[in-house]
């Protein structure tokens, strides 16, 4: 599925009036494209508020990042667990009204999560880099910045906020984008989790051959429905390449209980990323323990 970048909408000046003519391609075709277009504007605004140089200065004073992949590979429970802090989503709306990111992060860590994912998108997920900063103050396990990253500036934002890893989504990035952003991330000490949704995207990522952490998202980008068979199909069809390249495989979306985790583990997943099902529970601590089999 092609995700276009926001097209220019040129202004026309007549006498003292300036106006823009609506272009037939001036509206996003789907929710992911809408998010990408909004992200472009969000980053433009952020750059005006905080310069890249300011972010670099802040990063200089930060401690070294934690090893995200090692935290997953060294997990006592299998598959390893990445618990996600997410207040809302386009498909569900508000997931948790009593949202206390710091408390949720502490419960995830106490419950036995190996890593934590923090949504930093504002408009569609009601997150933010300020949320990541607050969570970082409370926990010691590695943190993934989960956002719709299009530009190097966003990786600097993630690192400055205290992230140890960042998400890149193959569906919204070209091969050149993926290669360049991976180099920027490496420079910053950030681990990249690159996310794919189908065999075409997975082949692209494998051919680039620089990623050791790949996430298979079980959610269909058009219908937003989830199907764990996506992990099964991709993990099994590309098992040899995944093994040869020592890739840590993460199954994402549509995971609700221990049975789901055991299922994707049997398909070849080394880790899982679980968000909505945990965020929806009254007892988050107990929910984490149940997922990893400690309750």
Swiss-Prot record:
Lineage top rank: taxon: Bacteria
Pathway the protein acts in: Amino-acid biosynthesis; L-tryptophan biosynthesis; L-tryptophan from chorismate: step 4/5
Alphabetical UniProt keywords: Amino-acid biosynthesis, Aromatic amino acid biosynthesis, Decarboxylase, Lyase, Tryptophan biosynthesis
Catalytic activity: 1-(2-carboxyphenylamino)-1-deoxy-D-ribulose 5-phosphate + H(+) = (1S,2R)-1-C-(indol-3-yl)glycerol 3-phosphate + CO2 + H2O
GO biological process: L-tryptophan biosynthetic process
EC number, UniProt record: 4.1.1.48
SUPFAM superfamilies, per the entry: Ribulose-phoshate binding barrel (SSF51366)
Keyword Amino-acid biosynthesis: yes
Pfam families reported for this sequence: IGPS
InterPro entries tied to this protein: Aldolase_TIM (IPR013785), Indole-3-glycerol_P_synth (IPR045186), Indole-3-glycerol_P_synth_dom (IPR013798), Indole-3-GlycerolPSynthase_CS (IPR001468), RibuloseP-bd_barrel (IPR011060)
GO molecular function: indole-3-glycerol-phosphate synthase activity; phosphoribosylanthranilate isomerase activity
Keyword Lyase: yes
UniProt family annotation: Belongs to the TrpC family.
Stored HAMAP family: IGPS_B
Protein's recorded name: Indole-3-glycerol phosphate synthase
Species per Swiss-Prot/TrEMBL record: Prochlorococcus marinus (strain NATL2A)
